[in-house]
């Protein structure tokens, strides 16, 4: 056939590698009405899980496109379960996969998460026996963490300027960008201030409180965070029960902080949280598996709602009773 009569076929569009295709997908917030885009860290985490899923699809099903991968999300869920992953871990992985690939998470069959079955920072694990998991590997960080009770990533970004006071003149550690990009003030007790000042007086450098070497370890900082939450619950409960007027003072501080946070949320395009006096009234009663776990370990079966919310707001930045109890006070 001569060149003159040769039929030309259009070139097939090159999609790129599966990893590249996933990296180019736009990730939408779960609430489509929200004007605020998802945080960079959340999108990065979701795409990481989606790319891991893509690599699994390529290995097991020779998938080359995102659409081909979508058919195997249920297979991936079954694979994770057979691999011994916990219900919480499976949900975390699938949440990223489904959000990035735009597949409703509720269409995927997966194990039900039970908070009482969580294993993070609970019991003894092999990592706890490692030489780089004890206090001696980084005593300055360890002792500071026992008081601060923040997340590992947040220690990395502390600066020598982050020792401040809140609106009630309580000494606080300023976390400029916590989980989800939230700014938070981590309360410390006045009697703990000298120990904290000693660390701030000897920073790693002009921009970091702790060096990379100090952070390079396997210390279970989440466990120390849970211990701090338990300590502060006892602290607030004792003052509520023994000091005249302290309950009213604490409620006033919480309401002020709540309203200030709501104002910031509105300015950033988020809905305000709904306040109810029930949040600081009566006791939070454990039920179901959490109640069984508490009984097994001889822990309280109910918690003072006011003391609980104080811990959740001033020390964990979760703003919720249930998360505080299940993930911190029951972390044994």
Predicted regions, residues:
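Short, basic/aromatic-rich helical patch in the C-terminal catalytic core of site-specific tyrosine
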Residues: 155, 224-237, 312-313
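Conserved tyrosine-mediated DNA breakage-rejoining catalytic core shared by Y-recombinases
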Residues: 157-195
